[in-house]
Amino acid sequence: MAKMIAFDEEARRGLERGMNQLADAVKVTLGPKGRNVVLEKKWGAPTITNDGVSIAKEIELEDPYEKIGAELVKEVAKKTDDVAGDGTTTATVLAQAMVREGLRNVAAGANPMALKRGIETAVASVSEELLKLAKDVETKEQIASTASISAGDPSVGEIIAEAMDKVGKEGVITVEESNTFGLELELTEGMRFDKGYISAYFMTDPERMEAVFDDPYILIVNSKISSVKDLLPILEKIMQSGKPLLIIAEDIEGEALATLVVNKVRGTFKSVAVKAPGFGDRRKAMLGDIAILTGGQVISEEVGLKLDAVSLDMVGRARKVVVTKDETTIVDGAGDAEQIQGRVNQIRAEIDKSDSDYDREKLQERLAKLAGGVAVIKVGAATEVELKERKHRIEDAVRNAKAAVEEGIVPGGGVALVQAGKTAFDKLDLTGDEATGAQIVKIALDGPLRQIAVNAGLEGGVVVEHVRGIEAGHGLNAATGGYVDLMAAGIIDPAKVTRSALQNASSIAALFLTTEAVVADKPEKTPAAPAGPGGGEMDF
């Protein structure tokens, strides 16, 4: 395919136009008075959302250079969402502000590499100040406030705080759709580990990229499975029962994997295969934990158990399993409560005996998985469109609350960035274009607060100047239009969200500024369809 190449200013301006189109669509959603965006779907009803990353994903531009610019900013939103579950719109606003200021300086003759160094130094300094500003989450109310702001709904914040209180910060919180109206919290014993399906063909829900099975059998094997001959006896027994199967093994490959995939695709037999978590002795121990939790046995030749001789009573059971590309959750295993408690006590004893911090940390993780459990938030709504949007917001709010527990909380509403900037730049000793790079960051830090004010119908510049002049920790409550002590009013953000948004935005901005050429696919001109044959002269 032929390529188009643009250089210098033409290349950068093309990227900027694409970035601006995407950022302008996303930034209207920022803050409590942010608007919604309607996304057309090829099938079904349109989606209404105020989630930055969902909007960004939908935007596809026609111009090749603009398309690349938009894709780069999508990466900012996606990366921030992956790390912290929120802050996608903030990251987009920051990236747009940095690129706009940066390109102005590059056009005026500044050295892009020096600007990049200045931006990186300034961002590191501001990130450090943000972590100093952060206060540890001490109360259930603070978790509720953080999650409420992310979801835009106080009732969501309360239910997430309740869930975290019950399962602890090590526990797992999942969100499910419900047929009833409103929100429900269901606490279930369960376990999650960091291994996903071996093949994407095992998915049952392509939209969420998950394999979800109710009431499955769970086969736990401490070896590789490559021959289908070894698997057949137990597969036949499970197929007769009509239940799905989760296989956890060191690896599944060759004809064994091919057989499972073919049967799954044809709809003959539902199954999903995942690799066992951990390595070496730790893997053995974790497989043992899963076996006790599900009431099964670890099939291992070390203890004289062969795969072709497995009976149904050696296979574990659970109420539900959810497998994504990265992790597996086993909900409500059918294991004996006494045996599970015995295993928990054994791990606690090992923690007390261990003198290695690393071993102790890994044992603590195993303990949390066995004893922590899973909280399920069931969400219902009047329409399918509202249900999807609400569920997505709650999932983001859960990640947001976990981020708050991890690195602490800072004043919300874009104020933390403005106030961290007040002290961060005093320590920097930069000259020339590097100092200009730092100045670009300083100007960009006002962006989120300015946009929140604009979305609330206020004058952005006036609000930013007012916040700079008032007491630290105080800022705009955009919902009421007043200036308050943000922490006391529960207007807070996780430090991790704010820090990730800034770091990801600066990373992409630096790439924009140092771009000297863009190579894009040349759009193909589709030839017009040939004219059809004439109808001829016909008499009737």
Swiss-Prot record:
<dbReference type="GO" id="GO:0005524">
    <property type="term" value="F:ATP binding"/>
</dbReference>
<keyword id="KW-0067">ATP-binding</keyword>
<keyword id="KW-0413">Isomerase</keyword>
<dbReference type="GO" id="GO:0042026">
    <property type="term" value="P:protein refolding"/>
</dbReference>
<feature type="binding site">
    <location>
        <begin position="86"/>
        <end position="90"/>
    </location>
    <ligand>
        <name>ATP</name>
    </ligand>
</feature>
<dbReference type="InterPro" id="IPR002423">
    <property type="entry name" value="Cpn60/GroEL/TCP-1"/>
</dbReference>
<dbReference type="Pfam" id="PF00118">
    <property type="entry name" value="Cpn60_TCP1"/>
</dbReference>
<comment type="subunit">
    <text>Forms a cylinder of 14 subunits composed of two heptameric rings stacked back-to-back. Interacts with the co-chaperonin GroES.</text>
</comment>
<dbReference type="GO" id="GO:0140662">
    <property type="term" value="F:ATP-dependent protein folding chaperone"/>
</dbReference>
<protein>
    <recommendedName>
        <fullName>Chaperonin GroEL 1</fullName>
        <ecNumber>5.6.1.7</ecNumber>
    </recommendedName>
</protein>
<dbReference type="GO" id="GO:0051082">
    <property type="term" value="F:unfolded protein binding"/>
</dbReference>
<feature type="binding site">
    <location>
        <begin position="477"/>
        <end position="479"/>
    </location>
    <ligand>
        <name>ATP</name>
    </ligand>
</feature>
<comment type="similarity">
    <text>Belongs to the chaperonin (HSP60) family.</text>
</comment>
<dbReference type="InterPro" id="IPR001844">
    <property type="entry name" value="Cpn60/GroEL"/>
</dbReference>
<dbReference type="InterPro" id="IPR027409">
    <property type="entry name" value="GroEL-like_apical_dom_sf"/>
</dbReference>
<feature type="binding site">
    <location>
        <position position="493"/>
    </location>
    <ligand>
        <name>ATP</name>
    </ligand>
</feature>
<dbReference type="InterPro" id="IPR018370">
    <property type="entry name" value="Chaperonin_Cpn60_CS"/>
</dbReference>
<keyword id="KW-0547">Nucleotide-binding</keyword>
<dbReference type="InterPro" id="IPR027410">
    <property type="entry name" value="TCP-1-like_intermed_sf"/>
</dbReference>
<dbReference type="GO" id="GO:0005737">
    <property type="term" value="C:cytoplasm"/>
</dbReference>
<feature type="binding site">
    <location>
        <position position="413"/>
    </location>
    <ligand>
        <name>ATP</name>
    </ligand>
</feature>
<feature type="binding site">
    <location>
        <begin position="29"/>
        <end position="32"/>
    </location>
    <ligand>
        <name>ATP</name>
    </ligand>
</feature>
<keyword id="KW-0143">Chaperone</keyword>
<keyword id="KW-0963">Cytoplasm</keyword>
<comment type="function">
    <text>Together with its co-chaperonin GroES, plays an essential role in assisting protein folding. The GroEL-GroES system forms a nano-cage that allows encapsulation of the non-native substrate proteins and provides a physical environment optimized to promote and accelerate protein folding.</text>
</comment>
<dbReference type="GO" id="GO:0016853">
    <property type="term" value="F:isomerase activity"/>
</dbReference>
<dbReference type="InterPro" id="IPR027413">
    <property type="entry name" value="GROEL-like_equatorial_sf"/>
</dbReference>
